[in-house]
Regions:
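C-terminal catalytic core of tyrosine-transesterase DNA break-rejoin enzymes
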Residues: 117
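Vicinal oxygen chelate
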Residues: 1-12, 23, 28-81, 85-114, ...
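Short acidic-aromatic low-complexity motifs
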Residues: 14-19
Length: 139
């Protein structure tokens, strides 16, 4: 008997400070805070933020440790209605863009930002059919 997923996938990402990352996603990127829990120390233990249909949960890393410096092994890839408009909105807010607007070979127009823990957040709008690099083929 096969099972199907009946809802959205929501990644749970461990961070050093849930408060810091929540503020970045809400204040800088325009997500909405939908739920969280404050621990005995007055800091968020976890929170869930949404942007459109996308949901991301952040939880405090074990022992409150920060992920190691640099790029993290998980990236977040979020579709937006108009990537150019979204990009311009973030730039006007002073958000640092880590990778500029680019049309990728797979047909998405993308840009990236880094969150305070080094997680790459891609924003994209599909604009073309995939055109694999020379010598590669889609399967």
């Amino acid at each position: 008997m096969s099972q199907t997923v009946s809802g959205r996938v929501m990644p749970i990402i461990a961070v050093g400070s849930v408060d810091e990352v929540r503020n970045f996603y809400v204040d800088a990127l325009g997500f909405q805070h939908v739920m969280g829990m404050v621990g005995k120390d007055g800091q968020l233990d976890f929170c869930t933020v949404v942007l459109g249909e996308a949901r991301v949960m952040f939880s405090r890393a074990p022992g409150g440790s920060r992920p190691s410096a640099g790029k993290q092994p998980v990236e977040i890839y979020l579709e937006v209605d108009d990537v150019d408009t979204f990009h311009n909105r973030l730039k006007k807010k002073g958000v640092a863009i880590s990778d500029p607007l680019t049309v990728q070979w797979w047909g998405d127009r993308t840009f990236k930002v880094l969150d305070p823990n080094g997680y790459e957040i891609w924003f994209y709008t599909n604009v073309a059919e995939p055109k694999p690099p020379t010598g590669a083929k889609l399967v």
